Amino acid sequence: MSTRNPQRKRRGGAVNSRQTQKRTRETTSTPEISLEAEPIELVETVGDEIVDLTCESLEPVVVDLTHNDSVVIVEERRRPRRNGRRLRQDHADSCVVSSDDEELSKDKDVYVTTHTPRSTKDEGTTGLRPSGTVSCPICMDGYSEIVQNGRLIVSTECGHVFCSQCLRDSLKNANTCPTCRKKINHKRYHPIYI
């Protein structure tokens, strides 16, 4: 009696075999993606004004952003000379903010300037100190206030200028320059006589 164990063959193969996955991919159809760009038609209305802000033109451009208020540029830039130096202007660059509202009078227009006119610089009516003056960046006193109060103008090794009292008080707390934090001590600064 010989018993044979017949081997069974599986038909169709394994469920997750590579061949099965390949057949599944080949038989399922995927919709093709169109790679062509569709043109978009731009309709330009007659009343709209288009301002190209990316180009550099020689003429100043005025843009009305709110339809009520507009900025008018009086003088935008200085014109260069042949040798490359800029011309000096006696008037300040400025712009005028005006309103279309009839209720507002012309006296209420706002003038915005980026530079101080020479007349106010000469009179000294501005709160800003002209260049060339010495002041302490800690107490904000100018040269005349420092000298009137019996203090000295002192400079550190790193070149920063303070009044003697402020620098002395600062060095009591930290042995560094108050401006650049370079290590200094009470022997590393000296008075300046102007």
From Swiss-Prot:
For the ligand (Zn(2+) 2), the binding residues are 158, 160, 177, 180
Motif placement: SUMO interaction motif 3: 61-63
For binding Zn(2+) 1, which residues are annotated in this chain's numbering? 136, 139, 163, 166
Chief location of this protein?
cytoplasm
**Residue ranges for motif SUMO interaction motif 4?**
71-74
Which Pfam family is one of those matched by this entry? zf-RING_2
Query: Which superkingdom heads the taxonomic lineage of this protein's source?
Result: Eukaryota
Residues annotated as region Required for ubiquitination activity? 1-20
Instruction: Give one GO biological process term.
Output: negative regulation of protein localization to chromatin
Keywords in alphabetical order: Activator, Cytoplasm, DNA-binding, Metal-binding, Nucleus, Phosphoprotein, Transcription, Transcription regulation, Transferase, Ubl conjugation, Ubl conjugation pathway, Zinc, Zinc-finger
Zinc fingers (RING-type): which spans?
Answer: 136-181
Q: In which tissues is it expressed?
A: Widely expressed with highest levels in testis.
Give the Gene Ontology MF terms in alphabetical order. Answer: DNA binding; identical protein binding; nuclear androgen receptor binding; nuclear estrogen receptor binding; nucleosome binding; SUMO polymer binding; TBP-class protein binding; ubiquitin conjugating enzyme binding
Q: PTM comment for this protein? A: Sumoylated; conjugated by one or two SUMO1 moieties. Autoubiquitinated.
Q: What is known of its domains?
A: The RING-type zinc finger domain is required for the ubiquitination of polysumoylated substrates. The SUMO interaction motifs (SIMs) mediates the binding to polysumoylated substrate.
What is the protein name for this chain?
E3 ubiquitin-protein ligase RNF4
Source organism per UniProt = Rattus norvegicus (Rat)
The gene that this protein is the product of is Rnf4
